[in-house]
């Protein structure tokens, strides 16, 4: 604990908490101040001036990062017949129907992404209380309820991330790993920022992005100037 506190203090000393850094500076500083002993995840966090209670100000979706995520996702697909075979051929880790529902109801959760064909959603609905709180419930807005299961599996395996604004207007997303080149992290950050900017509700008032930061697993938050993106 003492060593962790020492590392944290050392990291904080390198950061000017009153400054909003450019995206390039922030990425470099996030890597420099990372003290995790493993290949830490790099994440960005937005606070948006939106009211998610209003239907037209809810922000949710998915995208494929240009440089990938550095993470291998375990993909589960609910499908039958030809669509099940397509999912398997595309590289899905788990494919099934009632058997998977029973397994999940029994406490099994060794997967990161859940995809389903539309005709399977009545079955998947039984898992709402398990998958919903973990943001694993398939949804058309994130491309995880689809007949094109092969594409969905390939995207999930190839750098797809999902995002959603919480009740306070916060949106968080991973943009890669500390081991990534700075340029790849910057590219991913800019690509995600473009999606967030384009998602601005027409009815949103005032400054849209009120706070933006980048951090690593166990790292400290570094303010980013939205105008640098």
UniProtKB/Swiss-Prot annotation:
CDD domains on file: Ribosomal_L1 (cd00403)
Keyword set includes Repeat: no
InterPro entries per the UniProt record, alphabetical: Ribosom_uL1_bac-type, Ribosomal_uL1, Ribosomal_uL1-like, Ribosomal_uL1/biogenesis, Ribosomal_uL1_3-a/b-sand, Ribosomal_uL1_CS
GO biological process terms held by the UniProt record: regulation of translation; translation
One example GO MF annotation: tRNA binding
Gene Ontology terms: cellular component: large ribosomal subunit
Keywords from the named record: Repressor, Ribonucleoprotein, Ribosomal protein, RNA-binding, rRNA-binding, Translation regulation, tRNA-binding
Xref: PROSITE patterns: RIBOSOMAL_L1
Subunit composition and interactions: Part of the 50S ribosomal subunit.
Stated family: Belongs to the universal ribosomal protein uL1 family.
Function recorded in the entry: Binds directly to 23S rRNA. The L1 stalk is quite mobile in the ribosome, and is involved in E site tRNA release. Protein L1 is also a translational repressor protein, it controls the translation of the L11 operon by binding to its mRNA.
UniProt protein name: Large ribosomal subunit protein uL1
Organism of provenance: Streptococcus agalactiae serotype V (strain ATCC BAA-611 / 2603 V/R)
Organism phylogeny: Bacteria, Bacillati, Bacillota, Bacilli, Lactobacillales
């Amino acid at each position: 604990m003492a060593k962790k506190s020492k590392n944290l203090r050392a990291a904080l000393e390198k950061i000017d908490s009153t400054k909003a850094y450019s995206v390039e500076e922030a990425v470099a500083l996030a890597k420099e101040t990372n003290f995790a002993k493993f290949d830490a995840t790099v994440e960005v966090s937005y606070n948006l001036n939106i009211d998610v209670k209003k239907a037209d100000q809810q922000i949710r979706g998915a995208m494929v990062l240009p440089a990938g995520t550095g993470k291998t996702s375990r993909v589960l697909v609910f499908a039958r017949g030809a669509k099940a075979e397509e999912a398997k051929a595309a590289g899905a880790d788990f494919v099934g129907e009632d058997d998977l529902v029973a397994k999940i109801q029994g406490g099994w959760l060794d997967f990161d992404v859940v995809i389903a064909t539309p005709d399977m959603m009545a079955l998947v609905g039984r898992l709402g209380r398990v998958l919903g709180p973990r943001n694993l419930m398939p949804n058309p807005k994130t491309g995880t309820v689809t007949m094109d299961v092969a594409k969905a599996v390939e995207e999930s395996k190839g750098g797809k991330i999902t995002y959603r604004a919480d009740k306070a207007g916060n949106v968080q997303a991973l943009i890669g790993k500390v081991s990534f080149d700075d340029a790849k992290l910057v590219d991913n950050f800019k690509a995600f920022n473009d999606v967030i900017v384009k998602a601005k509700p027409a009815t949103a008032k005032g400054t849209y992005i009120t706070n933006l930061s980048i951090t690593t697993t166990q790292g400290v938050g570094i303010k980013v100037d939205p105008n640098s993106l």
